[in-house]
Amino acid sequence: MNPNATSKANILKTSREIIQQNGWAGVSIRSVASACGVSVGCIYNYFASKTELLSATVESIWSDIFHHSEDEVVFQDTLSCVRWMYQQLEDGCQRYPGFFTHHALGFVRQDTADGKQQMQRAWRHILEALCVVLQNDTKIRADAFTEDFTVEKFAETLFSLMLSALVRQDFDPSTVLEIVRRAIY
């Protein structure tokens, strides 16, 4: 037994590593327990089912992909942030092959409330960060946002465009950057 691998964070880290090496098919309660060096029961102490484990793993992958950049410059203006987000998506697709198209987007359509809730929580975090960038961007025109065209609505639009790019596996942000320039600068 490996007592250091029994934390929820370590179990999720191990699940991410299994996905990187073997894809989604490689993740099971048994395979994660084996890789952690713990009993199956230990995994069940944290996750009641494989679906719950996968849901939490999906959320942790989103967090891993969009971990806060150490380069604060990417959060000083909207254009830098959008470039960074698209780069993170591309890097995430390379680190977690098939994550976006085959599994993560499927959680939105899943019948499990927990899976949907975890995905929405991860997405809400990304949206909130984008709103903060928009609110702090000193380059934005004073009249850019109105009652009908709010920071939040624009952030949701940018996020929707990002998800669309994700499905298409098109990580060139140039069109979105031009939309940002024309809409708010």
Where would I find each of the regions flagged by the language model?
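Short hydrophobic clusters on alpha-helical segments that form packing/core surfaces
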Residues: 11-19, 61, 89, 162
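Helix-turn-helix
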Residues: 10, 14, 18-52, 56
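Hydrophobic alpha-helical connector segments
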Residues: 56, 70-95, 151-155, 177
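Amphipathic alpha-helical packing segments from all-alpha helical-bundle domains
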Residues: 94-95, 102, 112-140, 149-152, ...
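Helix-loop "lid/cap" segments that line or gate small-molecule binding pockets
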Residues: 86-94, 102-110, 133-134, 178-184
